[in-house]
Amino acid sequence: MQTKNVLNIFPSFLIGIALLILPSISFAGGHSLDELIAAAQKEGEVATYWHSSRMGKKVAKAFEKKYGVKVLATKMKDSEMTERIVREVSSGNVIVDLVGYDDGPMLDTVLTPQGFVENYVPPFLINNIPSNSRDPLIYLWQPFVFGYNSETYGDNCPIKSLWQLTEKEWSGRFHMWDPRIASSMLQMFSAMEDRSEDLVASYKKHYGKDLKLTEANAGLEFVKRLAANKPVLYNEDYEIAVSVGTRGQDKAPIGIYSLGRHRENKKKNLALALCDVHPFKGLNQPTYMQIVKGAPHPNAAKLLAYYVLTQEGANPWVGVVGAYSSNSSLGS
């Protein structure tokens, strides 16, 4: 692969990544909400590592204004976040309190079983959080979709099957997150392996013949062929959206990016459109929220976790097209 400085909306087609995650140990507190607010205010601040800059740019100010508790927010990739959490807890010098984290498999295999994080579901909201989003706590769902340039190709996506991305015509013309940076891509490939039968059927539907495997299953076969076809890799999905949607291209690429990037059509005059492809239109990416073991401000962390699951705290994310909170009582 080349590097470039690179299912609830569609129920039967978006891969549900959270299905791959096993339950963790629940961590709860006994405060009433008023008691929790008082305890958090006494602590005075809360430190976060977060997958999104919106925590620092939008949530932090509103939270401090509402509760008088300062939020020290650092945007961070999952890989760095994992390293810091492990190092801080292992050394007994914990700086961070609450994390917003995308890498479910790492959470399930390392951070939770080895005691680096603790699950907390605000008891004041528990009836609004579906049971399959509580343990580990999912606070946000973000659909990632396959998209194309509607100015270049018109009303119809230039491919009908994902297998076409492995053909010579699309060599170097599929743009995606670097799997070494974005765990969601590895999770997508893992989910494809679990859904190999769908890939087999898609191949037969498109080409009219059976898929010949050189790997153990169709999921691995697809990943092998895709990697051989030189996809272009990026560090940020914003860059993918721009590369796909920029106007004036004769052979615009296809990409996978968060559905919310379609807001750039208006902001940046892009021409992004959804690909109606089989067997999957994209994936439904969960983001988890966990308290770090030994957090210096545990009550402020719990209050912030609660706030992010309320309408006011969730607005910076759920106000974006496609994203929605795990709190079923909120609008999206």
Pin down the residues of each PLM region.
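Periplasmic-binding protein-like
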Residues: 127-128, 141-144, 220-226, 268-295
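Extracytoplasmic ligand-binding site segments that recognize negatively charged/polar headgroups
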Residues: 49-60, 72-86, 94-245
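A ligand-binding cleft/hinge motif common to bilobed small-molecule-binding domains
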Residues: 105-110, 245, 250-272
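Short, polar/charged alpha-helical segment
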Residues: 32-41, 49-70
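Mature extracytoplasmic/periplasmic domains
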Residues: 282, 287-332
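Bacterial N-terminal signal peptides that target proteins for export
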Residues: 2-14
